[in-house]
Each structure stands twice: as structure tokens, then as C-alpha cells.
Amino acid sequence: MNFHRYFNVDRPPVETCVVGTGDFGRSFLTQGLRVPRMRARVAVDRDAQIAAAALKASGADPERIRICTTAAEAGKAFAAGDFVAADDLALVVGLPVEVVIEATGHPEAGARHARLAIEAGRHLAVVSKELDSVAGPGIAHMAAARGLVSTPVDGDQPSLLIGLVTWAETLGFEIIAAGKSSEYDFVFDRATGLVTSNGRTEPVPALADHWELGGRAAAEIVASRAEAVAALPQRAVPDLCELLIVGNATGFAADRPDLHAPIARITEVPTLLAGKAEGGLLSGERRLDVFHCLRAPDEPSFAGGVFVIVRCTDRPTWDMLAAKGHVVSRDGATAMLYLPRHLLGLEAATSVLEAALLGVSSGAVAPRPHLDLVARATQDLPAGSTLAMGGHHHTIDGTTAELVPAVALSPEAAAPFYLAANCRLVRTVECGRLITVGDIEIAPDSELLALRRYQDAAFFGATAAGKVAENA
């Protein structure tokens, strides 16, 4: 694809507003100074000083950064060509920006920002996977009803993987699985017997016995590696959350609620994430999964990249491609096609430009709620306690995440993970049980709840939504 031709629209650059100036927002602002067809002059964070600092760090002229506390101040600064920093989207959403990038990572705040952007007639780029996992299809439906676009963003794995899946489908490939590498690699130094992952180093000399796949059964070596590194985390909520977004865009499903998540070397992935009939782990096709990249210190990472596993229907062609270095399974039946990157805000502009210039999303044409991310208690959770969301990965202590088929909210239904986050339990949840909507106290004015009810009404029918409104 020639991107210059794709975005060849004769008009002024697209003006944007980014809400949330953490890693993604900051990288978006930095690249925004360099994208010819886009401007990134407006930043919002919980403290305007944080937004201003992010603008300065991005390379904006400090003399042109204005901290604005009213809509009038913001309007004056924007008209003068200055950079605008604010502590509330409501102060700046009336500026002549075309796309709001929601990158806070906070589901309740993100729901409010989504509503404000759509009500103001702005396209929405949803970076916050926590928000998307609860009500992404509903937000897209709401935006489309107003002639607007809600889109995931290139730079994050969901949009990149949706692009790779649809590329493969366009070319007629038979897709067995799609996924991404996990948040962190497992880097094994065979000389010392040490494994490093996510800043932790553990002695695991036994892993040397499981370094090579060879002719071993997929399930056996995956189990052996998992046992060897049992001291290190092997599941991360963000992985499941991101794959949910892909599932809602493509209809792909998880093979098991917590994913297989094998620890695998890059060359092994098409062997392990193949059907059981082909010696792999999967019970069907069009499955979503993740792998933990096992590598030596001097080997390249998969870098949180995305992949599809496809069937090799023409063996001579794939034998030729394998000889050229493409990653083909040990029996030659499947191959992995992949993008070993996700550049966060540095490559998000393509999604922003698609929304503003072309009126299309980088995700599904019309996403549907196929999956829900839910929480299962890993310990007894007493009534009256709060399901506090915290940490870099926005986890909830005492729970683990799972992917299940999406349903409308009801007291008996499992509560979406990030709808339950920061809610108080009204009754004890025993270890091993899914947390249900009836277990939690949701603030009646929750904007996230309102968006989810809208989604349920749009996709599961007014009767289901009415039941939720009465009982949730």
C-alpha cells in the first residue's frame, strides 16, 4: 500500500486532542510534531501541569505552552497557534479538533471522555483497552449513529492484529490462530541458568532441558517450561484485554478462558499454536492466543508484536518460503506471518488520519460484543471490600482474568472486569468463583455502566437492557 496515495486529501492538517499523557500519550505528542498531515497541540491530564510537562518533553516550544483553566482561555491559546494544556476534556472539546485520543487507561474516566467527544461531534481514537473491553462496540455504534468514527489505534496490538488478520483474509489464507507476544519475554542465559522476565531474575537451570522443541509433544514441552519457571508470572490481564478487542472485531474466540499462553521460541509458534490434529494445542481454528517469547540474551525479541498462523495449502511454495527464512512449523503444515513491533503513539497517526480524512476505523467495520473479560476470585473476597484496580497492568488483587462469551448484564452474569474494578462487594465471593454483577455495588451515575447498557440494548435487545436497568 502507498500511504501517500491513501491519505492524499487536499486539506489542512488534522487537529487532535490527546487525553492522558502517560507512555502512549507522550509518544503520540512527540511524533505529532513530525506528522505532516496531523497536529497534536492539545493535551489533557488529571493535572494540567502534567499535560504541560508532556508537551514540553515532546519538543513543544515551552514559550508556546499555555495552561488553560477555562474554555475561553483554551480558545484564545488555540487560535494563537499555541499548545494547550488542561485538566478536563470539557474545557477543550469545543476547540476545532477533529479527533480525541482517549489514552488514560482508566475505564470510568474514559467513558466520560468518550461521551464528551461524541456529543461534541469529534471522532474518537480509543487507546484505553480497559474502556474498550467493557463497551467498545457500543461506543462504535454510538459514534456511527452520529456520523462519527470510533477506532482502535495503530501502535497498540489490537489495531495492528486486526489489520494483519484482515490482510490475511483478503489474500485468502486459512487462519488457524491470531495473537501477540506477551508483555514480557523470558530471557534465558544457558551459561548461568538464570531467567529474566519483567525486571525479575530467577535461577532456573532446569529450563536448559526444555530449550529445544525437537520432536517432543507440544503439550508436554509447554507444561514442562511452565513448571520450570513457575516462580515467574505467566498470565497478564492486558494480554487478554487486548485479544478481546480483536475478538470483537473479527469474531475469533479464545481456545480456553485463560489462553494457552505457551512459553515458546519464535520459530516454535506455528508448531505449538496449531490444531491438535497437527500436533498443536488448539481445539479449533480462528483462535486467539498469546505466547511468551523465550529467547537467549543475544537473540531478538518479538517486541510485543502480532501474528497469524496460517495453513500451508501449497507445500512446494511453503517449502520455498521456509528456505527463504519464513517461520514454518516443524511438519510444514502451518506458518507464522507476523509484525514484530508495536510502536505506541509513534504510529498512531495512521488511525487518526483514517478517521478524520477517510471516515473509517482501523478496526472492524462494525464491531460486535463477542467476548467479555471477567474476573475469577483466586482467594475469598469478603463482603464490603473494594475491588481496587492498581499497578502498571491495572489488575485487581485476589482475582485472575478470563475471556468468556459476551452476554447482556444481569445480576447472574459475570461482571466485566473493568466494570467491577473499584466497586465494593455487597457479598462474599468465594475463591474460584466468577464475580457477578449481583456481587458488586456499581455507582448509579457510572458513565461506564451507562455505556455498557447502551451496548447491551444495541446488540442484545431492549428487553435485556431493560432487565439490566432494573436490576443492576
What do the PLM-derived regions correspond to, one by one?
Residues 49-50, 131-136, 140, 157-161, ...:
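Short gly/pro/ser/thr-enriched loop/turn and capping motifs at secondary-structure boundaries
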Residues 55-56, 136-139, 162-165, 186-192, ...:
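Short acidic, glycine/serine/threonine-rich loops at helix termini
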Residues 104-120, 128-156, 166-167:
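Rossmann-fold NAD(P)-binding glycine/threonine-rich loop
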Residues 1-116:
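N-terminal glycine-/serine-/threonine-rich beta1-alpha1-beta2 phosphate-ribose binding loop
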Residues 2-7, 200-471:
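C-terminal catalytic/substrate-binding lobe primarily of soluble NAD(P)-dependent oxidoreductases
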Residues 143-147, 152-227:
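Rossmann-like NAD(P)H-binding beta-loop-alpha module
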Residues 46, 105-106, 128-132, 155-156, ...:
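Short, ordered loop/turn segments at secondary-structure junctions
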